[in-house]
Amino acid sequence: MKQQSEVKSLKEGKFVIIDDEPCQIVSVQHSKPGKHGAAKARVDAIGLFDGSKRSIVQPVDAKIYVPIVERKNAQVISIAGNMAQLMDTADYSTFELEIPEDLQGKINQGEEVQYMAAMGKLKFSIRQ
C-alpha cells in the first residue's frame, strides 16, 4: 500500500517509492536554482529489498508516493537451508523468507523475529 506526500515533507530515515521500489531515504537536499525557477529537492535513497542506491530530483511542491511499511513479529516454524518458514503472531498466517547471510546461524526454530512488509514484499527486519 502507498499514499501520496509532498517532496518537501520527506526526511532522512523515512520511506519513499522510487522506480516502483520502496526505499529508505539517506539524504534530502533542497536548492533554489534561480530567479524564476522553483525550489528543487534531491532525494537519495537505498532500496529496502534490493539494497541498490536510487536518487530523484523533483520540485519541492511535487507529489510523490510513500510506501506504508509495517514492522511485524513472527515465530520461526522451521529452517531449511537459507529459507525460514514463519508464522505471523498476529494473524497466524504462514510464509517463507530467505535468511540474509548476516543472520544465518543466528535464527533458531521457535524464536520470535521481526520482519518488514511493504508493497506486497517481505523481508527480515533491519533491527534484530
From Swiss-Prot:
It is found in: Cytoplasm. InterPro entries: IF5A-like, IF5A-like_N, NA-bd_OB-fold, Rib_uL2_dom2, Trans_elong_IF5A_hypusine_site, Transl_elong_IF5A_arc, Transl_elong_IF5A_C, Translation_prot_SH3-like_sf. It holds the Pfam family IF5A-like_N. The keyword Cytoplasm applies. GO terms for cellular component: cytoplasm. The modification Hypusine is found at residue 35. GO terms for biological process: positive regulation of translational elongation; positive regulation of translational termination. PROSITE patterns: IF5A_HYPUSINE. GO terms for molecular function: ribosome binding; RNA binding; translation elongation factor activity; translation initiation factor activity. It comes from the Archaea. Keywords: Cytoplasm, Hypusine, Initiation factor, Protein biosynthesis. Belongs to the eIF-5A family. Functions by promoting the formation of the first peptide bond. This is Translation initiation factor 5A. It comes from Methanocella arvoryzae (strain DSM 22066 / NBRC 105507 / MRE50).
